[in-house]
Amino acid sequence: MCLRFFTWCLVCFMFVPALAWAQHPNNKAEQAIRNEIERQSRREAGQLKRAGWKVMPNKTSIEQQVRDVRFMEAATHAQSGERLYLISSSCASDSSYLMARRKADMSARDKMVQQVISLIYNSGAENARSNGELEQLPFIAENGTVTSAHLQYVVPVLECYRMDRDGCYEVLVTIRADYARTCQVINAVLYQK
């Protein structure tokens, strides 16, 4: 009994460190990626500040917003490796801050819709090519049937402004949406499922 327990403990003490050692290179690689994203986001935030961009009072700092956006761009699902978020940015000018913000937001949404349509179409074309059915690509409805209302879980993640020489507000907005759900909804609309 004692020998069995001793053998079990010996195996466990050898097996657990081996697992930890096997995961160690992954942690180093992840940390290197994390450090690179941090470095790039600090550089980009510095460029925005030097260009005169500011955030509204009571908003998160530019550094933190840029950092969050960069990590969202790199975020993937643990099992499938699929992206988690769609990211889109746009800039607009107006004499009113709210109108400039609204224009930039709508433009970013429209860009995101076109991005998703392109992703879905390219994926469908690639699947048809790999199956040897190039001339039998499925019919895709007119792009006008897909609107920004089909985007799922849209959230602004970066919002900053600057004043131009004419006294107009120039607003930069970056939004994110759920990748899988948005692609699923727009795919259903495009193929009219």
Predicted regions located by residue number:
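Bacterial N-terminal signal peptides that target proteins for export
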Residues: 1-9
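Domain-level marker for long, solvent-exposed, non-transmembrane regions
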Residues: 21-193
